Amino acid sequence: MKHSVLLLFLLFAATAAQARDPAQVRAFRHTHPCPATHSTTGACPGWVVDHLAPLCGGGADKPANMQWQRTAESYKKDTRERAYCKCIKTKSTHCVLP
């Protein structure tokens, strides 16, 4: 029974850690205006807010773990991170974020 409770806690914690908080993005944008428009609100053409360390890999959903990234570059990084996160879910010990 203790193992089941621990497993459920770990699964819940992993899922909760991946949740994105819009308030954290607003906090990031407040101190890091859009590179294209220099605005702290609204659209930022050609740019996205990116997590330096992926959430699935334990990265925090906090402004300190965020950066502006060009949209085209984000597609490449997202592809690599999805492969990494998929590997983590298999519990492999050989997962490397390229």
Question: What kind of region is each of these model predictions?
Answer:
Residues M1-V49, A53-P98:
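Nuclease and nuclease-like effector domains acting on nucleic acids or nucleotide cofactors
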